[in-house]
Swiss-Prot record:
Pfam families, alphabetized: CRCB (PF02537)
Protein name: Fluoride-specific ion channel FluC 1
Any coiled-coil regions, as ranges: none
Organism annotation: Bacillus anthracis
Function: Fluoride-specific ion channel. Important for reducing fluoride concentration in the cell, thus reducing its toxicity.
Gene Ontology MF, one: fluoride channel activity
Lineage top rank: taxon: Bacteria
Alphabetical GO biological process terms: cellular detoxification of fluoride
Length: 137
């Protein structure tokens, strides 16, 4: 059993969680509305990054697979948060903010799919460009 992967994922997870916390605080400094913008932006960025990572960086073989796993599962996994999305939605519903709750869930799901698609498209484009320039995987 490779114990190093657990350390890599754990450290990356700590960094992802701290990044989410800091970015959330930063966004809350200028966003003072009911809509949970910080969680939405963080989750959308994570969707883009994970798709790009798995489509492009992982296939270049420039990083060991343990590092790719650490970034994807550890950093991005702890950077994004489905549980916060769920709790914030319930809080909005409990405060009768039905419209905002619907908008939040809709933006999260559709936006996540769009950002994942963009990350995949960019990764695929960069990979094809990399391969046509004579570099091989």
């Amino acid at each position: 059993m490779r114990k190093l992967i657990y350390i890599i994922v754990g450290i990356a997870g700590i960094l992802g969680a701290l990044s989410r916390y800091y970015l959330g605080l930063t966004i809350h400094e200028f966003w003072h509305h009911t809509f949970p913008l910080a969680t939405l932006l963080i989750n959308l960025a994570g969707c883009f990054l994970l798709a790009w990572l798995t489509t492009y960086i992982a296939k270049l073989n420039i990083l060991p697979s343990d590092v790719i796993t650490g970034i994807g599962t550890g950093f991005i996994g702890s950077f994004t948060t489905f549980s916060t999305l769920s709790v914030e939605t319930i809080q909005l519903i409990n405060h009768s903010e039905w419209g905002i709750a619907f908008l939040y869930v809709s933006c999260s799901i559709l936006g996540g799919l769009i950002m994942s698609g963009l990350g995949y498209t960019l990764g695929d484009f960069l990979l094809k460009k990399h391969l046509t320039e004579g570099d091989h995987l």
